[in-house]
Amino acid sequence: MTIAPEPNSFRTGPDERGRFGIFGGRFVAETLMPLILELEAAYETAKKDPAFQAEMESYGTHYIGRPSPLYYAERLTEHLRAKAPAGQGAKVYFKREELNHTGSHKVNNVLGQILLARRMGKPRIIAETGAGQHGVATATLCARFGLKCVVYMGAVDVARQAPNVFRMKMLGAEVVPVESGTKTLKDAMNEALRDWVTNVADTFYCIGTVAGPHPYPAMVRDFQSVIGRETREQMIAQEGRIPDSLVACIGGGSNAMGLFHPFLDDREVEIFGVEAAGHGVQSGLHAASLTGGKPGVLHGNRTYLLMDGDGQIADAHSISAGLDYPGIGPEHAWLHEMGRVTYLSATDSETLEAFKLCSMLEGIIPALEPAHALSKVLELAPQRPAEHLMVMNMSGRGDKDIPQVAEIFGTKI
């Protein structure tokens, strides 16, 4: 990795071509270009429209339940300080995105995109989903606004996320199991893109993460940045200053980008993204694109990808369906190369330990995705002084993972 010269601001990207340095861009079929340009124009107009922002805020407050709390994890903090040298052990806070309607951060972005689809007159919404959280959020808002909803989901994920599949169907969505490839998130995204090309006139593709062709990475980031903006205000209100460090899990990376982006130019704030190391990066069974991948093109953008020796997209593995993706958002790839964000990885076993500990100490059952981030908080917090303020994004709740985790622990539900 080469550290490029530091820019005046880390928050000005992407450029007019949708690039973050050499990452991002628009690598799509010609048939999609008019749609992409139409979407970009609609988003740029909506972004500047006070009525659109007011609508976002109103539904955010009254339907999603924002702002989400910034919660001092007191027992976890005490537990970690007991293991640390005297005077060590950061004060750990959770940004409680799991308390949002539908149970994760995903709804922040979906609300923005569905309001945009309505402005554009698109009555049919398609989405891809891995853990099912983005699918549930999309189905929920389609139900709220009376829009047709089709969700593509890898057949493997359909099996391991049965509660969310049922939720989507209850909300009126059509769930399409994808049997091609590895039958996970990558393949679901491929099928959604095929659908979009086929149904250009009436369909809006609601992408769930900071990936895909421009303007999606920037648009999803902007809709998720409410997380970081609230965190800044809440921490100043509670502690009189901004946090010293931020930690979030990364699949495509939307929850992380939402927390990180408002702090990127606060150079004193340490920022950590946590990828899924699966059975260990050396095992080859992982989803850590930055740790174990290299630059390439997938799903319309250039970013870090897991590839085999022939340059083909490799299979990703994670205990968490939401992190089981062989790429990462292009802005994360750029921040990695710029050295502004430190990217770590957590194994399945480390994640399960954090999952158990959080449940027992804080009475909060985390989703397996943020449990990855929490496993690194357990390592990082004891290395920081007691006055250090560390915020972890609790990006989803663990209800959806209970059947899977119970089975791992030998309990049949």
UniProtKB/Swiss-Prot annotation:
Record's GO cellular component terms: cytoplasm
Modified residues (N6-(pyridoxal phosphate)lysine): K106
Membrane-spanning residues: none
Alphabetical UniProt keywords: Amino-acid biosynthesis, Aromatic amino acid biosynthesis, Lyase, Pyridoxal phosphate, Tryptophan biosynthesis
Enzyme class (EC, first level): lyase
Keyword presence, Lyase: yes
Catalytic activity of the protein: (1S,2R)-1-C-(indol-3-yl)glycerol 3-phosphate + L-serine = D-glyceraldehyde 3-phosphate + L-tryptophan + H2O
Source species, domain of life: Bacteria
Record's keyword annotation contains Transit peptide: no
EC number, UniProt record: 4.2.1.20
InterPro entries attached to this UniProt entry: Trp_synth_b_CS (IPR006653), Trp_synth_beta (IPR006654), Trp_synth_beta/beta-like (IPR023026), TrpB-like_PALP (IPR001926), TrpB-like_PALP_sf (IPR036052)
CDD domains documented for this protein: Trp-synth_B (cd06446)
Record's subunit section: Tetramer of two alpha and two beta chains.
Family statement drawn from the similarity comment of this UniProt entry: Belongs to the TrpB family.
Name listed for the protein in its UniProt record: Tryptophan synthase beta chain
Protein encoded by which gene: trpB
